[in-house]
């Protein structure tokens, strides 16, 4: 196959691994800087141009679109889809999962376990909002945040009121969530590929920190997940419409609680912790998806 990888960082571990594995399996791979792609949105002959040339057709595209460029990145991916290029994850599914509020509402509708989560617009409603999620301590999250940025643990009612009011008054959209104390600064990242958990790791926050993101100094180790956790991760990815996803789960007294469903999960931490060839599983699935697309009707 001829595969395009949309990535702003060709030397990023995840991008390099996908290139290496795909090439080792006989595929032709080109890494394209997402923001350098530009589009001709024509009715009969849509095209994508890159560095002064019109791109030839590809069999498949792997989107590695960062959260900060979701709008433009999904537009580029839609253009590939208009040109009948098969996408590892669809533009619709990526957009759905990147909207954290919408994602929470969809997961809630399907009965997936979640931390109690509040959303409000007016500062007049802050005291009741805090009560609604169980009071302090609680967690405030910027809807546009990523890698633990814009996530604040408020340990008292006064601190919670101040932080929430400050965010709202500066026109930031936030979620207010209950703090799951029994998780003890740890979460589980499940890598789901084609409806199966192919790898999992437990991420533990640094002492004095509650955010377990590896970008914030958290550590990772292999973990054996329960059947309920496995089913929750698979179902969460399915609800988002993602064939490849990183599903973040907290262990709580009332079972697994989903924090986030990531459409472009990093591979370095989970491959190192689990010892699993996740990149290989992704390329194998891409091959399977391509074979299904080109299989003649019976």
Curated annotation (Swiss-Prot):
User: What does this protein need as cofactor?
Assistant: Mg(2+); Mn(2+)
Q: Which GO terms describe its cellular component?
A: cytoplasm
Which residues are noted in the entry as ATP-binding?
Answer: 141, 178-179, 187, 211-213
Q: Where does Mg(2+) 1 bind?
A: 248, 260
**Keyword terms, alphabetized:** ATP-binding, Ligase, Magnesium, Manganese, Metal-binding, Nucleotide-binding, Protein biosynthesis
Q: How is the cofactor bound?
A: Binds 2 magnesium or manganese ions per subunit.
So which domain of life are we looking at? Answer: Bacteria
Residues binding Mg(2+) 2 are: 260, 262
Which EC number applies?
6.3.2.-
Q: Could you identify this protein by its name?
A: Probable alpha-L-glutamate ligase
């Amino acid at each position: 196959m001829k595969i395009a990888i949309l990535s702003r960082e060709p030397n990023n571990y995840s991008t390099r691994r996908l290139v290496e594995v795909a090439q080792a399996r006989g595929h032709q791979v080109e890494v394209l800087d997402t923001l350098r792609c530009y589009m001709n949105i024509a009715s009969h002959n849509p095209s994508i141009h890159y560095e002064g040339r019109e791109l030839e057709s590809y069999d498949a595209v792997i989107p590695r679109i960062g959260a900060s460029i979701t709008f433009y990145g999904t537009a580029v991916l839609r253009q590939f889809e208009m040109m009948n290029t098969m996408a590892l994850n669809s533009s619709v599914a990526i957009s759905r999962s990147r909207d954290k509020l919408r994602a929470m509402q969809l997961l809630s509708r399907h009965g997936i376990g979640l931390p109690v989560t509040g959303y409000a617009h007016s500062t007049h409603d802050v005291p009741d909002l805090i009560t609604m999620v169980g009071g302090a301590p609680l967690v405030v999250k910027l809807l546009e945040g990523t890698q633990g940025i814009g996530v604040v643990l408020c340990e008292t009612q006064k601190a919670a009121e101040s932080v929430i009011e400050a965010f709202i008054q500066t026109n930031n959209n936030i979620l207010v969530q209950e703090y799951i104390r029994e998780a003890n600064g740890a979460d589980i990242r499940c890598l789901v590929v084609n409806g199966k958990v192919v790898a999992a790791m437990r991420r533990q926050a640094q002492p004095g920190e509650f955010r377990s993101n590896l970008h914030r100094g958290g550590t990772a180790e292999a973990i054996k997940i329960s059947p309920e956790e496995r089913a929750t991760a698979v179902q969460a990815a399915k609800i988002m419409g993602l064939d490849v996803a990183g599903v973040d789960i907290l262990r709580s007294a009332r079972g697994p609680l989903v924090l986030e469903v990531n459409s472009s999960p990093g591979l370095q931490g989970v491959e190192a912790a689990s010892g699993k060839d996740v990149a290989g599983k992704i390329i194998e699935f891409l091959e399977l998806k391509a074979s299904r697309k080109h299989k003649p009707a019976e």
